[in-house]
A protein has these predicted regions:
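Rossmann-like S-adenosyl-L-methionine
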Residues: 1-182
Length: 182
């Protein structure tokens, strides 16, 4: 992806870099990006997906609850000479997201990579954004399944496919990925 990210010892970052690279590549493939797309990257962290997305899309909006992570994501975008990213600090686990400025924009694509608890609070807002495709990456298939039900049954999306990646060999944990379309 021709991107570099600096991080602190306590920052969250995928430790299995080989599989992380494959996961990011797969997410980009599933999004079917056009060079004119605006993409919303929820739970963006340091920019694991944001930076590669910015190499292929017209604009990427990253949203993350941790101010320090957002500052490092901005610094990474600057260091990688990416000028088509914007970042917002927002607790995506909040019950009331309706006043958030990033929810007032339009997006062709959305990527979510929430923590183990999932994206229950943000899912009800995604239907209003009318994105054509959503890729949901999760470290907990159970919360992905719960949120997929909401996307399909109340937000008007169709599940096109899902799979898992063995991001954590020799453990019971997997990284799951699903793609939805309208």
């Amino acid at each position: 992806f021709n991107t570099r990210v600096q991080f602190e010892p306590l920052d969250f970052i995928q430790v299995n870099q080989a599989l992380n690279r494959k996961m990011v590549m797969r997410a980009l493939e599933l999004l079917e990006l056009e060079s004119t797309d605006t993409v919303l990257d929820l739970f963006c962290g340091l920019g694991n997906f944001t930076l590669p997305l910015a190499r292929q899309a017209a604009k990427v909006i990253g949203v993350e609850g941790d101010q320090a992570m957002v500052e490092r994501a901005r610094a990474a975008a600057h260091a990688n000479e990416l000028q088509n990213t914007d970042y917002y600090v927002c607790n995506l686990m909040s019950e009331d997201l309706s006043k958030e400025p990033w929810l007032k924009r339009s997006y062709e694509r959305i990527l979510l990579d929430p923590p183990r608890a999932g994206a229950k609070e943000v899912i009800p807002h995604l239907g209003k954004l009318k994105a054509e495709r959503i890729v949901y990456v999760s470290c907990d298939p159970a919360t992905l399944a719960r949120d997929a039900g909401e996307l399909v049954h109340t937000q008007g999306y169709k599940l096109l496919g899902a799979g898992v990646m063995d991001m954590f060999p020799h453990t019971a944990h997997v990284e799951s990925i699903a793609v939805f379309a309208r």
